[in-house]
UniProtKB/Swiss-Prot annotation:
Protein name: 3-dehydroquinate synthase
Encoding gene (name): aroB
GO cellular component: cytoplasm
GO biological process: amino acid biosynthetic process; aromatic amino acid family biosynthetic process; chorismate biosynthetic process
Cofactor: how and how many bound: Binds 1 divalent metal cation per subunit. Can use either Co(2+) or Zn(2+).
UniProt-annotated location(s): Cytoplasm
Enzyme class of the recorded protein, top EC level: lyase
Binding site for NAD(+): 70-75, 105-109, 129-130, 142, 151, 169-172
Pathway recorded for this protein: Metabolic intermediate biosynthesis; chorismate biosynthesis; chorismate from D-erythrose 4-phosphate and phosphoenolpyruvate: step 2/7
Length: 359
C-alpha cells in the first residue's frame, strides 16, 4: 500500500512524499540515474538499513557513504565538514551529484544543509527513518546545524527532490523514539481541528501501531505541513510560524541540556504544555481548556513534565535566542482554541513572571 502527496512550496519546485507500507528503495531510482550518490546516515541506521539500500541501487552508479555518529549533539559543524570533505575528496560535482539522507531528523537536517551549500546547491533525497522526521523535519525544506549558543542557528531553506519513507521503519524504532515522534503529530492536531478529532477517535489504533491507521496518520500530518509550507515557504509572512507550536520552549530545553537530555520530540511535548500554560496565564484560554489540551497530549504517552535539572535563568537566556524574536521582542506561538494558533509578542518581564509562578 502506497500513499503519495505533493508539496508545492512558494518559491521552489514541487516534489512528492511517498509513504509506503513496505520498504522498497527502488522508488527513488529515477532520482539517482546517471548520478554520483553520497549516502549520509548514522551508525545506528547504517547497521539496520544501509546494506539493503545500497543493494537497491543499480550497478553503474558511483556511490559513496558518509556515516556520522548518532545523536542531536552531532548535528554540528564537525559533522557538516565530514560530509563536505567526502564530497570534495571524491570529486563530486554540482550537476551530477545527489545526496541521500538516510536517517532521522538530525541526518535529514544536516544532509539538506550540506546539499544547500555545496557548490551553491545540489540535489538531495530524504529517506526519513523515524516517525518524527517523517511527519516534520523531512517536509518543508528547513535544513540546519546547531551552534553552541542555540539550536538550528545555521541553516537554509532548501527543498528535497523527493521524500520516500515506510512505516516498516517502525519495526526497529525504539518506543521512546516513536512517542517522541507522536509529539509532532499531536502538534498538528492543535493546528487542525479535523485532525484533532481524527486522532482522538483513532488513538487506540495509533498506540497499537495499526499499519493502515499509521499510513493515514503520516499522510494527514504531512498534508497539514505541506499546506502551511505552500503559503509561507521561507517564513516571510508569519503563516508558517504556527508549525513552531511548542518549539520556543522546547528548543530552550534542548539547549539547556546541551542536546543530551530530552529528545527533540520529547522537548516539543513539554514545550507545548508550557505554551498552553502560558496561553492560560495570558487569559487566552480557560483553566479547563488548558487541562483538556494537556490531557490530550499525555493520552498518547507523551510526558509533559518539565526537566528538574534546568535553572530558570539559563532557560530564560536560551529562550531569548529564539529565531522568531526580533527587535528585542519575544515571540510565541500561543493557543486560543483547537485549530486557532497565533504568533504573539510578549515582553521579557511577562515571560519571567510566568516562569516564576509555573516552577
Amino acid at each position: 500500500m502506497i500513499s503519495k502527496l505533493s508539496v508545492n512550496p512558494t518559491f521552489s519546485p514541487s516534489y512528492n512524499i511517498i509513504v509506503d507500507s513496505v520498504l522498497d528503495f527502488s522508488h527513488i531510482l529515477e532520482y539517482v540515474t546517471n548520478k554520483q550518490v553520497l549516502v549520509v546516515t548514522n551508525t545506528t541506521v547504517a547497521k539496520l538499513y544501509l546494506t539493503k539500500f545500497l543493494a537497491a541501487l543499480v550497478d553503474d552508479l558511483d556511490v559513496r557513504t558518509c556515516i556520522l555518529e548518532d545523536g542531536e549533539q552531532y548535528k554540528s559543524q564537525q559533522s557538516l565538514d565530514k560530509i563536505l570533505s567526502t564530497l570534495l575528496e571524491n570529486h563530486f560535482t554540482r550537476n551530477s551529484t545527489v545526496l541521500v539522507a538516510l536517517g532521522g531528523g538530525v541526518i535529514g537536517d544536516i544532509t539538506g544543509f550540506a546539499a544547500a551549500i555545496y557548490q551553491r546547491g545540489i540535489d538531495f533525497i530524504q529517506i526519513p527513518t523515524t516517525l518524527l522526521s517523517q511527519v516534520d523535519s523531512s517536509v518543508g525544506g528547513k535544513t540546519a546545524i546547531n551552534h553552541q549558543l542555540g539550536k538550528n542557528m545555521i541553516g537554509a531553506f532548501y527543498q528535497p527532490k523527493v521524500v520516500y519513507t515506510s512505516i516498516e521503519f517502525y519495526k526497529t524504532l525504539p518506543q521512546r523514539e516513536y512517542i517522541a515522534g507522536m509529539a509532532e503529530v499531536v502538534k498538528y492536531a492543535f493546528i487542525s481541528k479535523d485532525f484533532y478529532l481524527w486522532l482522538d477517535s483513532n488513538r487506540d489504533k495509533i498506540l497499537a501501531k495499526d499499519s493502515v491507521t499509521l499510513i493515514e496518520m503520516v499522510k494527514r500530518s504531512c498534508q497539514i505541513k505541506a499546506q502551511v509550507v505552500a503559503m509561507d515557504e521561507k517564513e516571510l509572512t508569519g503563516a508558517r510560524a504556527i508549525l513552531n507550536f511548542g518549539h520556543t520552549f522546547g528548543h530552550a530545553i534542548e539547549k539547556c541540556q546541551n542536546y543530551r537530555g530530552l529528545k527533540h520530540g520529547e522537548a516539543v511535548g513539554v514545550g507545548m504544555a508550557q505554551a498552553i500554560d502560558f496561553s492560560h496565564y495570558l487569559g487566552l484560554i480557560s483553566q479547563q481548556q488548558a487541562k483538556d489540551f494537556k490531557d490530550f497530549i499525555v493520552s498518547f504517552g507523551i510526558s509533559i513534565d518539565f526537566p528538574n535539572d534546568i535553572c530558570q535563568k539559563e532557560f530564560l537566556e536560551a529562550m531569548l535566542l529564539d529565531k522568531k524574536n526580533s527587535n528585542k521582542e519575544l515571540k510565541f506561538i500561543l493557543i486560543e482554541n483547537i485549530g486557532s494558533l497565533s504568533l504573539q509578542k510578549q515582553s521579557k518581564n511577562e515571560l519571567e513572571q510566568f516562569l516564576d509562578i509555573s516552577r
